[in-house]
Amino acid sequence: MFDLNQSLFLRALRRQPVERTPIWIMRQAGRYLPEYRKVREHAGDFLNLCKNPELACEVTLQPLRRYALDAAILFSDILTIPDAMGLGLYFAEGEGPCFTNPLQDTKAIHTLKIPSIPESLSYVFDAARLIRQEMPKELPLIGFSGSPWTLACYMVEGGSSRDFKRILNLIYTEKEAAHLLLNKLAVSVTAYLIEQIKAGVNAVMIFDTWGGVLTPQNYKDFSLAYMHQIVQQLKKEYPDIPVILFTKNGGQWLEWMAETGCDALGVDWTCDLASARKRVGGKVALQGNLDPAVLLTTKNCIRREVGSVLASYGYGTGHIFNLGHGITPDVPPENVAIMIEAVHEISPQYHL
């Protein structure tokens, strides 16, 4: 039987020698694929797709059939936890995620219940079990969650936001309530990731999409502290499951992030990979960081930019190739193939 620990992805995460740089793509199951759009249409809407384990399994497997990727990522949404807490998640056309019951005041935070994760999010774990059963045995499956801070942003703002005025007001004027909310979310995220691991995921990633809007001190207090808490709990129960942290626009805080005990850091395209490696490469693996906009260009440009990312990281293991954020819906699928082929062709020279 194939030992998943021998997969390129898990070896690179643990900074063990690899023959070439592994690659997967944030949002690799997504709207850029015509086959995904067909399944989503059949599901009726995005949330139905997330809540149907068979359909979630199908869209998770689609990019693996099309491309030689080194990992799959569970198809779900970061806002499943707030939905399970009773906030009423829905997706408005052209607006992204919204809540019918956002947290309007501190009373709502105090009365917010921590849900029973195994029951309320069973559809996620059913999907994970099904995917693990159906996907290639030699490929790892990545589970994920939003960070407590990022979930809190959506829950207090009521959806996406340009300026995050409400949540920032909360952390400045109602610190105690903010910490209460973040602690409830940290407990929920920990339970959520543990259930995903029990269902068969081989690594987990925490997406801190909005950590980069904070001041350095507020990042430490309101985002990093809670991710640290989650990593410590996960490592206590599952020391061998790698944990990846990703704070978008958080390149200035890599040293702090590396102190959490995580195994890898995601870096976005605004961060220089060579200097990131100098700063934290002795402690953690690095994942990233091609600018997603490159996939809208030409074959020559894609190959050149892939080469630049690989050269920037340099020789040796500890690098997982990825985009600096999620792939956009307008990317031609053939350009993804060009990127993957380029990683396969160019990266072996860095692993001699």
Curated annotation (Swiss-Prot):
Q: Which SUPFAM superfamilies match?
A: UROD/MetE-like
Listed under GO cellular component are: cytosol
Q: Which PROSITE patterns match?
A: UROD_1, UROD_2
Q: In which pathway does it act?
A: Porphyrin-containing compound metabolism; protoporphyrin-IX biosynthesis; coproporphyrinogen-III from 5-aminolevulinate: step 4/4
**Which InterPro entries does this chain map to?**
UROD/MetE-like_sf, Uroporphyrinogen_deCO2ase_HemE, Uroporphyrinogen_deCOase
Q: Which UniProt keywords apply?
A: Cytoplasm, Decarboxylase, Lyase, Porphyrin biosynthesis
- Site positions per UniProt: Transition state stabilizer: D77
So what does this thing catalyse?
A: uroporphyrinogen III + 4 H(+) = coproporphyrinogen III + 4 CO2
Pfam families reported for this sequence: URO-D (PF01208)
Q: Which GO terms describe its molecular function?
A: uroporphyrinogen decarboxylase activity
What family does the entry list?
Answer: Belongs to the uroporphyrinogen decarboxylase family.
Q: Which HAMAP family match?
A: URO_D
Question: What's the stated role of this polypeptide?
Answer: Catalyzes the decarboxylation of four acetate groups of uroporphyrinogen-III to yield coproporphyrinogen-III.
**Protein name per the record:** Uroporphyrinogen decarboxylase
* Gene source species: Legionella pneumophila (strain Corby)
Question: What are the leading ranks of the lineage?
Answer: Bacteria, Pseudomonadati, Pseudomonadota, Gammaproteobacteria, Legionellales
